[in-house]
């Protein structure tokens, strides 16, 4: 093994390390996607679930902004990622220890789960940030490396779906933390993306965030993202309740997640070719429309697990497009010294949208029913696409794309 690694150049070794970080992060994440199912089993209604998720989004806003600015000030994305991975994994593993049988249990969970999100909400954004920045700087193929993350998420989802009847939902929390040790260890060996030299002790450094918010393209993307993430929050967080409404066991949720992750792979693999032919904004636009098609299918035609799987394929395709294009879009728009902050504020904006999506979504779901709810969500996806399309007017995007992504 040592001889094999000695023959690899620095970029090849870092590509393997990045797969260990990002790929196995998503493998571990697949085991931790059953929080909604756990709370559903604990007696939480869709409205109560919406409140929990909204509170989590509030904390998420502070989380990604805090860790983003900490990363830029320290000049180290890697240290921040290690911190949030360790903190988020430990606190998430302890969720089943919060009692659910007492009268005050829902309040305890509504306090503890958002607290977990101070770390957990920043785990995936900064794992992705480490990957996209190193891919750009080392001229690695982001689409291929990220597709391995989707592939490993698929494998993890299938494993937990088969294991869940024997394992039990409450044990998925600590299993997630156990598998998260792999990306934590691999992050120690990851390359630190280029950054400013951290400020000396006692030295104050201006972040110049006004430079970021004067960027019209970035602000237009934030506007699109606000509507888009309201729809995403509504679509994803209430899917177990939708499954129950059409007679599908919500414990089959892992199969849906595995299929979606599999469908992300084609667009990620061909992202270089797509970027050579289409501007990033067009790819982002296509992603929201594909997700809207899924919601139309759920609202009009799905009535079983197989038909759900058919339409969820569209969401997977759309998510593959969005993953491959959105991170690089933010990376290209942001100044070199504000890239982590740009990603952090975009993620914070998604959390703000998540608050509205979860609070309103839970109440609307209970009021109008699952089918009509998902038709409404499809309209939000189409609306976000329309708003983003309007921002194209009078602007020309440079279509010349570096070959590394």
PLM regions: where:
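Cytoplasmic membrane-interface "Motif A"-like loop-to-helix N-cap segments
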Residues: 72-85, 276-288
């Amino acid at each position: 093994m040592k001889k094999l690694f000695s023959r690899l150049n620095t970029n090849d070794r870092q590509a393997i390390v990045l797969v260990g970080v990002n790929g196995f992060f998503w493998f571990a994440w697949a085991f931790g996607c059953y929080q909604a199912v756990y709370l559903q089993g604990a007696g939480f209604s869709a409205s109560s679930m919406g409140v929990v998720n909204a509170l989590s989004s509030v904390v998420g806003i502070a989380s990604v902004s805090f860790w983003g600015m900490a990363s830029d000030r320290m000049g180290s994305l890697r240290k921040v990622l290690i911190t949030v991975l360790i903190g988020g994994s430990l606190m998430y593993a302890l969720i089943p220890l919060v009692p659910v049988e007492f009268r005050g249990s829902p309040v305890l969970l509504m306090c503890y789960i958002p607290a977990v999100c101070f770390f957990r909400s920043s785990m995936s954004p900064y794992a992705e940030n480490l990957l996209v920045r190193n891919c750009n700087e080392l001229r690695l193929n982001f689409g291929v490396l990220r597709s391995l993350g989707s592939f490993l998420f698929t494998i993890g989802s299938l494993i937990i779906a088969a294991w869940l009847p024997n394992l039990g939902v409450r044990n998925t929390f600590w299993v997630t933390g156990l598998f998260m040790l792999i990306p934590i260890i691999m992050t120690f060996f990851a390359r630190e993306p280029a950054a400013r030299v951290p400020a000396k002790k006692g030295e104050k450094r201006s972040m110049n965030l006004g430079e970021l918010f004067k960027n019209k393209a970035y602000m237009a993307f934030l506007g699109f993202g606000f509507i888009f993430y309201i729809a995403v929050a509504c679509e994803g967080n209430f899917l177990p309740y939708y499954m129950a409404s059409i007679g599908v066991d919500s414990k089959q949720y892992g199969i849906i997640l595995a299929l979606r992750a599999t469908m992300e792979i084609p667009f990620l693999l061909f992202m270089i070719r797509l970027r050579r032919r289409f501007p990033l904004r067009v790819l982002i636009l296509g992603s929201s429309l594909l997700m809207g098609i899924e919601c139309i299918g759920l609202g009009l035609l799905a009535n079983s697990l197989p038909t759900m799987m058919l339409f969820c394929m569209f969401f997977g395709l759309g998510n593959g497009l969005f993953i491959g294009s959105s991170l690089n879009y933010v990376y290209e728009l942001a100044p070199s010294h504000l890239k982590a902050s740009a990603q952090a504020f975009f993620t914070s904006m998604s959390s703000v949208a998540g608050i509205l999506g979860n609070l309103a979504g839970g109440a609307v779901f209970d009021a109008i029913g699952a089918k009509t709810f998902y038709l409404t969500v499809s309209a939000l996806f189409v609306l976000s696409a329309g708003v983003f399309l309007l921002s194209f007017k009078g602007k020309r995007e440079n279509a010349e794309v570096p070959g590394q992504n």
